[in-house]
Amino acid sequence: MTYTVTRAGQPLPGGPPYDVTVIGAGVVGTAIARELARYRVRTALVEASDDIGNGTSKANTAILHTGFDAVPGSLEARLVREGQRTLAAYAAGTGIPVERVGALLVAWDEEQLAALPDLLAKAEKNDYHAARLLDADRLAELEPNLGPGALGALEIPDESVICPWTTPLAFATQALLAGVHLHLDCRVTHIGSGPGLHTLTTSRGPIRTRQLINAAGLHADEIDRLLGHDTFTVTPRRGQLIVFDKLARDLVHHILLPVPTAAGKGVLVAPTVFGNVLLGPTSEDLDDKTATESTGHGLAQLREKGRRILPRLIDEEVTAVYAGLRAATGHEDYRIKEYPDLRYIAVGGIRSTGLTASMAIAQHVAGLLARTGLDLGAPTELPPLTLPGLGEATDRPYLDAALIARDPAYGTVVCHCERVTAGEIRDALDSVLPPRSA
């Protein structure tokens, strides 16, 4: 089977203009490309960096949200609710790891405790009816390692954790196998719009397209301005996180959330599908859209807050630290808007819920394309896809004696922290969209 992926130093393909070009190959952009692959349209996915999922999509808390705390009636609330169901079903069919661990919003003082009933009411307005209030005794039963002083909690049983990396990989792989073209190392610097056609000036040459979708994440406002708009500004909000060793996994059984504030959901402690424990994120509004470094001050803040939430966690070994940037816009809702006269759709302001909502956003955008003059026709089913199992809740290759007997490479552990085998690395290098080494 043939598919088209181009990189720096390779020519862009010629031929007629694309019907649709999607700018940005994060989880939202790849989801849109996958959705469009179901239709008979010639589609390109354009990415400035050298790989998919290289921005916010690769550095987040990896939570599959229920949408219980979204603004009721907002577009985000609807798309998160729909996306959670759609992505959970898709993950089950493709092998993307998901664990339904539930979440606890823990109240540490009387003011936070008094806020929990309002959060329960908000969840019900968002059509989530499984939330329930817990007293301090029940909370201690569920999470015996919590720090002293917890007064109660709101339980959200259906909050889950998911793999944030294989999700866009699955979307992109299916899109490529269905005929979507992926152009990496392809930064858009100018857009010329004429009758019936956009011409994108990129770092690798021109790309012509009839319809344009802006899913550029942190840079969505810049792309929007190239089309003559100034409707939102993206402020990069850095979130630093600490990854603790797998030996810490038994210390926590739920996603432990603080009572949220206007700045975000705050610092959490969460298990991961890989068997580690996350602590973070910070919330730092910056000017630099490339500032993904961890800082001593930020990590010290996290350790201080983590010591109160789960004191024993701070004594565990740290596997890694990382930081990601979220696309804050100052608006409470997603900035998704179609411009029929320009044959253009802006998909901006997609914050931490973007992973959960990605498939629903893609379906919503496909619907908006009709308003910009594109007849998609009837959808077709995409070929099934199964990804390698990375979650610790399932049998990994290093545990599969029969698999190792057939292929000893799966018994050769290369990374002992994450238990990665030579066979898995070989498979990744032979995949439709292999990782790129320097």
Predicted segments with their positions:
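N-terminal Rossmann-like FAD-binding beta1-loop-alpha1 element of flavoenzymes
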Residues: 18-45
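C-terminal catalytic lobe of FAD-dependent flavoproteins
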Residues: 264, 273-274, 285-413, 420, ...
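Short beta-strand to alpha-helix junction loop
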Residues: 72-81, 106-115, 154-173, 292-297, ...
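Extreme N-terminal leader/targeting segments of oxidoreductases
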Residues: 1-20, 38
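Glycine-rich FAD pyrophosphate-binding loop
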Residues: 37-59
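Helical element adjacent to the flavin cofactor pocket in flavoenzyme catalytic cores
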Residues: 154-211
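Dinucleotide-binding Rossmann-like beta1-alpha1 core, especially the glycine-rich loop
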Residues: 62-138, 142, 151, 266-267
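Flavin-dependent oxidoreductases
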Residues: 31, 191-280, 284-293, 304, ...
